[in-house]
């Protein structure tokens, strides 16, 4: 069982601050979702939360991780009063989204789930792979998506136990082991009855940061399906429209890291995304 220190958060900077959109991930992979959300909602305020004290989530027992995330959100909601919360993490979404909605019914939650439905609609060969963390692969929720939307396809679930950590290293500018990447993605590629896998669903928000590496190392071209834009669109659809005469008190977008001690590479990355540390 993995443990992480308890965390607390400061209150929002002022009483008249605009209620933010809170984007949450276990690390920095959710920045892919933040990037798309800002494109669609440039006038909104964001708080990005990286639970780096608990990263990676794959090392946790499910009950302990569920308890941690639900408790963490109680503190985040009290501190930042978000208008909506985006769980930009497949592992957290498939495990705890229902618990969060039950615990905090006043806050709308948008989850991140494997993009199996659009993959099934888009595939030409009928061979689709889902590249995910082992936790996401294990969850009944993922298999329910296949049963609901992709019974006409052959869907292979691939649990990559090291890619999220590799992605974090890549984002930091560190050298990565490309042989390890090849080993992790190889099971995604199937040849069957003259057909080949033509879509790989990126079912972890860290993975789009490795998309160019995947393309270069893949045995043949496929469509690497990134759900970030769809998550951003769903968020927009749940927000209340602004009044034409609404006066905004826009403050800086914030970065919150639960370790309270981000290293230089993370600080530089967050600042490159225009985030200010809380």
Curated annotation (Swiss-Prot):
Pathway(s) the chain acts in: Cell wall biogenesis; peptidoglycan biosynthesis
Keyword RNA-binding recorded: no
Residues noted as binding substrate in the record, renumbered to the chain: 25-26, 57-58, 90-91, 205-206
Pfam family, one: Asp_Glu_race
Catalytic activity annotation: L-glutamate = D-glutamate
Enzymatic class: isomerase
SUPFAM superfamilies, per database record: Aspartate/glutamate racemase (SSF53681)
Gene Ontology annotations of biological process type: cell wall organization; peptidoglycan biosynthetic process; regulation of cell shape
Keywords (A to Z) from UniProt: Cell shape, Cell wall biogenesis/degradation, Isomerase, Peptidoglycan synthesis
EC number: 5.1.1.3
Molecular function via GO: glutamate racemase activity
Active-site residue list: 89 (proton donor/acceptor), 204 (proton donor/acceptor)
Cited function: Provides the (R)-glutamate required for cell wall biosynthesis.
Family: Belongs to the aspartate/glutamate racemases family.
Protein name: Glutamate racemase
């Amino acid at each position: 069982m993995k443990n992480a220190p308890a965390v607390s958060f400061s209150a929002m900077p002022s009483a008249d601050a605009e209620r933010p959109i809170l984007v949450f991930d276990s690390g920095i992979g959710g920045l892919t979702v933040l990037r798309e959300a800002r494109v669609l909602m440039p006038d909104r305020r964001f708080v990005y939360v990286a639970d780096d004290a608990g990263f990676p989530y794959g090392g946790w027992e499910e009950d302990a991780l569920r308890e941690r995330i639900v408790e963490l959100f109680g503190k985040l909601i009290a501190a930042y009063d978000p208008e909506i919360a985006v769980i930009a993490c497949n592992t957290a979404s498939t495990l705890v989204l229902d618990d969060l909605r039950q615990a905090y019914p006043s806050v709308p939650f948008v989850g991140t789930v494997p993009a199996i439905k659009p993959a099934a609609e888009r595939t030409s060969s009928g061979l689709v792979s889902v590249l995910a963390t082992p936790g996401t692969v294990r969850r009944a929720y993922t298999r329910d998506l296949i049963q609901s939307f992709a019974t006409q396809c052959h869907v292979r679930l691939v649990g990559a136990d090291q890619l999220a950590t590799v992605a974090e290293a890549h984002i930091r500018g560190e050298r990565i082991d490309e042989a390890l990447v090849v080993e992790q993605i190889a099971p995604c590629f199937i040849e069957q009855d003259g057909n080949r896998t033509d879509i790989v669903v990126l079912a972890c928000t860290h993975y789009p940061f490795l998309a160019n590496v995947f393309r270069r190392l893949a045995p043949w071209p496929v469509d690497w399906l990134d759900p970030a834009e769809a998550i951003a669109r769903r968020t927009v659809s749940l927000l209340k429209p602004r009044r034409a005469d609404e006066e905004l008190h826009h403050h800086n977008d914030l970065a919150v890291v639960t370790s309270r001690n981000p290293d230089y590479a993370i600080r530089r990355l967050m600042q490159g995304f225009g985030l200010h540390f809380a």
